[in-house]
């Protein structure tokens, strides 16, 4: 990211054996916090986020060097991985509301529908995808916009990060704002983009991503990490995606 003039944390130290790295601290002035401020210019904040996304998507290098100077090829965000992520919905969330008797057949149908959606993706996997491009990972630092949590980036569909930002579960936004953000992306991105295909993939990947998030929240709730009230269900539902 940094070599491509993207403001991202510098890596200072590492200990791969102990799963430890030390990175630059950008503070906590996230776009999420700025959006929640009274009188904030929401569309301007989102436009700046889209500007950054466009710059990230211009990165074409697929082989990079890690901290040890070893070459590392960024993996492809294949449909198989997308399926496994979306399947978290049936693995963890569906079982909370479907009887044990019906659950096997329900899960079969859910997984069938996931595969159907993925089979209808049209855009080639040739864009750097952050995978968590949302308002909590975007930080204003020294009057510039920075991106954090970049370690899981893959080469995938250009619509994925766009869906992550616009249909973000962390910040509720109305349809008008969502449409304005989406149209701004179309305006400043590559003119060769097929608008029909982009919208198709955007909608599919938004569903897939939110299924993954619901599954993750359900799994965390089961392990008592998301309880915000005496009722586990209340704690879970308070964080259910709103998009």
Sequence positions of predicted segments:
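Single conserved hydrophobic/aromatic residue that forms the stacking wall/gate
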Residues: 227-243
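An alpha-helical support segment within catalytic cores of ATP-dependent transferases
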Residues: 61, 65-73, 80-81, 85-128, ...
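ATP-binding pocket architecture of kinase catalytic cores
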Residues: 1-84, 122
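A general structural signal marking secondary-structure boundaries and capping sites
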Residues: 5, 53-67, 93-97, 121, ...
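All-alpha amphipathic helical-bundle segments outside canonical DNA-binding/catalytic cores
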Residues: 74-77, 195-206
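Short, polar/flexible loop-turn hinges at active-site or ligand-entry regions and domain interfaces
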Residues: 31-43, 97-102, 171-173, 222-226
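Active-site activation/catalytic loop segments of kinase-like enzymes and analogous catalytic loops
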Residues: 87-97, 158-193, 204-223
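Active-site acidic catalytic loop and adjacent metal/ATP-binding pocket
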Residues: 56-57, 115-162, 169-176
């Amino acid at each position: 990211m940094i070599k491509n003039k993207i403001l991202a944390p510098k890596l200072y130290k590492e200990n791969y054996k102990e799963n430890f790295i030390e990175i630059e601290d950008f503070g906590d002035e996230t776009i999420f916090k700025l959006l929640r401020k009274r009188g904030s210019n929401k569309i301007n904040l989102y436009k700046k986020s889209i500007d950054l996304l466009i710059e990230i998507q211009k990165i074409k290098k697929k082989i990079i060097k890690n901290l040890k100077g070893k070459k590392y090829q960024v993996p492809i965000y294949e449909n198989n991985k997308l399926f496994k992520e979306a399947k978290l919905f049936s693995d963890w969330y569906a079982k909370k509301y479907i009887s044990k008797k019906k659950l096997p057949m329900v899960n079969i149908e859910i997984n069938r529908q996931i595969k159907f959606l993925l089979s209808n993706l049209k855009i080639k996997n040739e864009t750097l995808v952050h995978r968590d491009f949302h308002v909590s990972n975007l930080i204003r630092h020294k009057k510039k916009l920075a991106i954090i949590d970049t370690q899981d980036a893959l080469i995938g569909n250009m619509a994925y990060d766009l869906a992550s930002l616009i249909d973000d579960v962390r910040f509720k936004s109305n349809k008008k704002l969502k449409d304005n953000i989406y149209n701004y992306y179309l305006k400043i991105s590559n003119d060769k983009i097929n608008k029909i295909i982009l919208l198709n993939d955007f909608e599919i990947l938004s569903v897939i991503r939110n299924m993954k998030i619901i599954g993750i929240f359900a799994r965390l709730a089961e392990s008592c990490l998301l309880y915000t009230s005496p009722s586990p269900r209340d704690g879970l539902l308070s964080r259910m995606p709103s998009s």
